Regions:
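Dinucleotide-binding Rossmann-like beta1-alpha1 core, especially the glycine-rich loop
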Residues: 1-14, 18, 157, 195
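Helical element adjacent to the flavin cofactor pocket in flavoenzyme catalytic cores
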Residues: 30-88
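Active-site catalytic microenvironments for nucleophilic, acid-base chemistry
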Residues: 50-54, 99, 103, 258-262
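Short loop/edge segments at beta-strand edges and connector loops
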Residues: 11, 60-62, 209
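Active-site substrate-recognition segment that forms the wall
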Residues: 66-68, 73, 83-88, 93-229
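C-terminal lid/capping helical subdomain adjacent to the catalytic/cofactor pocket in oxidative enzymes
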Residues: 9, 14, 56, 222-224, ...
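Mobile beta-alpha loop/short-helix "lid" or hinge segments that flank ligand
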Residues: 12-24, 125, 163, 168
Length: 281
C-alpha cells in the first residue's frame, strides 16, 4: 500500500466469494483487484514489433562471445555472426547474465533457479485472476523461515491461473540445480498436493503436460538494474527471477532514462549492481 498498490487483507469468507473453489480451511487472503496477467509470448513479440518500428534491428540465434573494450569503456560485442559496435551495452541475459558480466570482469551473483509447472486439461470456468499461496513468496524472500528441508530444497508452493482455453497452469518450484530443465516426479507430486490442498476439486482433473524454465535468481531477491561503477557504457538489467515479465516495462523505462538522461524518474539505487561489487570487494 505504501508503494501505491491497491491491495487489502480479506477474510476467508470474502476470498471464497471471489474464488468459490477455495478450500474451506484457509485463514484469509491478500487481494489486489487491479492485478492482471499477460501472455508472455505475445507480449515479447509485441515488444519486438514495437522496437522494430522505432528502428531496432533484432539479431536472433547470435551468441555474444566477448565484449570489445577500450580501457574501461565498452565499444561493442564479438558474436558468432561478427562484431557489432556500440558505446552502450545492456546485459539483459536473464539466467545467463553472469556469463556476460564475466566478459567485462564482473562477478554478478545471478544463478538459474528452476521452476516446474503443470498444465491441466481444459475445464469449465474455475477461477479468475491468479492465486498464489503465501509460501510462494516466503521461499523467495524469507527462505530462512522454512524449516522443512524438502520444501526448502524444491521450493514447492502454489501459483495457479486459468488460461483462455480453459486449462490451468499450476506451479511451481524454486530449485537451485544449475541449468537442468527436466521435470521430476517428486516435484510434480509436491505441486499437485499443494494445489489440491487449496482447491480440493482439482483431485479429479487430468494433467496433460509439464514443463520447466529457469529464473534468474539473486541472493537478496531483488533484480540488478543500472550502471556499473568503473565501466563506462555497461548496464545491467537482470536477476528479476519470476517477475521479469511483470517488471519488464518499468525496467526498460527507468534504465532508458538513466542511459539517456543520466537520471531516472524513480531511483534505481536499491537495485544497483554496485551493491554486489561492494560486497565482493
Amino acid at each position: 500500500k505504501k508503494s501505491g498498490v491497491d491491495i487489502e487483507m480479506i477474510s476467508a469468507e470474502e476470498a471464497r466469494k471471489i474464488t468459490p473453489q477455495l478450500s474451506k480451511d484457509i485463514y484469509g487472503a491478500l487481494y489486489s483487484p487491479t492485478g492482471g496477467k499477460v501472455n508472455p509470448i505475445k507480449l515479447t513479440l509485441g515488444f519486438a514489433r514495437a522496437a522494430k518500428k522505432l528502428g531496432a534491428t533484432i539479431q536472433i540465434e547470435t551468441e555474444v562471445t566477448g565484449i570489445i573494450m577500450e580501457g574501461n569503456a565498452v565499444k561493442g560485442v564479438h558474436t558468432t555472426k561478427g562484431d557489432y559496435f556500440a558505446d552502450t551495452i545492456v546485459n539483459a541475459c536473464g539466467s545467463w547474465a553472469a556469463f556476460t558480466a564475466k566478459m567485462v570482469g564482473l562477478d554478478m551473483p545471478i544463478k538459474p533457479r528452476k521452476g516446474q509447472l503443470i498444465v491441466t486439461e481444459p475445464i469449465g470456468h474455475f477461477m479468475d485472476g491468479t492465486l498464489q499461496c503465501a509460501r510462494y513468496n516466503v521461499i523467495k524472500f524469507r527462505p530462512e523461515t522454512i524449516k522443512d528441508e524438502n520444501i526448502l530444497r524444491m521450493g514447492a508452493s502454489l501459483s495457479i491461473e486459468q488460461t483462455e482455453s480453459g486449462g490451468l497452469i499450476i506451479g511451481g518450484t524454486r530449485e537451485l540445480v544449475g541449468y537442468d530443465r527436466e521435470n521430476s516426479l517428486e516435484a510434480i507430486e509436491a505441486i499437485l498436493k499443494r494445489a489440491v490442498r487449496f482447491f480440493p476439486a482439482l483431485k479429479d482433473v487430468c494433467i496433460i503436460r509439464a514443463f520447466a524454465g529457469l529464473r534468474p535468481y539473486t541472493p537478496d531477491g531483488l533484480p540488478i538494474i543500472g550502471r556499473v561503477d568503473g565501466l563506462e557504457g555497461f548496464y545491467m538489467a537482470a536477476g528479476h527471477e519470476g517477475d521479469g515479465i511483470a517488471l519488464a516495462p518499468i525496467t526498460g523505462k527507468l534504465l532508458a532514462e538513466q542511459i539517456v538522461n543520466g537520471k531516472e524518474s524513480y531511483s534505481l539505487d536499491p537495485f544497483s549492481p554496485n551493491r554486489f561489487l561492494e560486497a565482493h570487494n
